């Protein structure tokens, strides 16, 4: 880290500012953050258990959700007994979770709001991760599609979005969409039968 800072003419004492937690979250390198080592160890064990396909969580797959008003409510209703563990927490419209549904591991991708470059990158990474472990995807969508902003165009949103579409189209894992609202690009990427979704 100090070599990177020195090369850019920054003071090595500013390592936390430029290379710390906030920078790792912003770049997408950090997936989870915990206040203490004990909690971190427990969550690592949870993630490894999830990736291995084991589940010790019992829940009724036919339960009726009492009140589902938001995307986060829907995620809670779909997942067994609050098993959803959010990974790659950030301010994006897209949230990603490891969870169990009827005892089986699933990846849950929820979108509430317009899709930006940050969202497309996050979706691509998550779909590729699920593919590596043969984990089904559940998308929960409430989105009007692309954020039509000049700054998104300048960042190359079309190219970044195309990479997310490619990852989704190449994924052979089962995909199920839960739709509140999916318009344009959001529908095509996160719910369309043509890209492999059922709903």
What are these language model-derived features?
Residues 1-199:
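Ligand-binding clefts of soluble mixed alpha/beta catalytic domains
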């Amino acid at each position: 880290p100090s070599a990177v800072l020195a090369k850019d003419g920054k003071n090595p004492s500013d390592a936390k500012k430029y290379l710390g937690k906030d920078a790792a979250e912003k770049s997408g390198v950090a997936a989870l953050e915990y206040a203490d080592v004990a909690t971190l160890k427990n969550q690592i064990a949870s993630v490894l258990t999830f990736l291995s396909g084991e589940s010790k969580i019992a829940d009724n797959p036919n339960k009726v959700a009492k009140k589902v008003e938001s995307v986060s409510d829907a995620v809670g209703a779909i997942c067994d007994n609050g098993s959803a563990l959010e990974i790659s927490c950030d301010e994006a419209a897209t949230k990603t979770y490891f969870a169990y549904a009827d005892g089986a591991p699933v990846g849950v991708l929820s979108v509430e709001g317009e899709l930006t470059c940050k969202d497309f990158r996050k979706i691509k990474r998550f779909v590729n991760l699920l593919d590596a472990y043969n984990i089904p995807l559940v998308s929960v969508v409430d989105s009007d599609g692309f954020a039509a902003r000049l700054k998104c165009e300048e960042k190359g949103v079309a190219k970044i979005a195309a990479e997310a579409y490619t990852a989704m189209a190449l994924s052979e894992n089962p995909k199920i969409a839960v739709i509140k609202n999916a318009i344009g690009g959001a529908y095509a990427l996160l719910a369309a039968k043509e890209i492999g979704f059922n709903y």
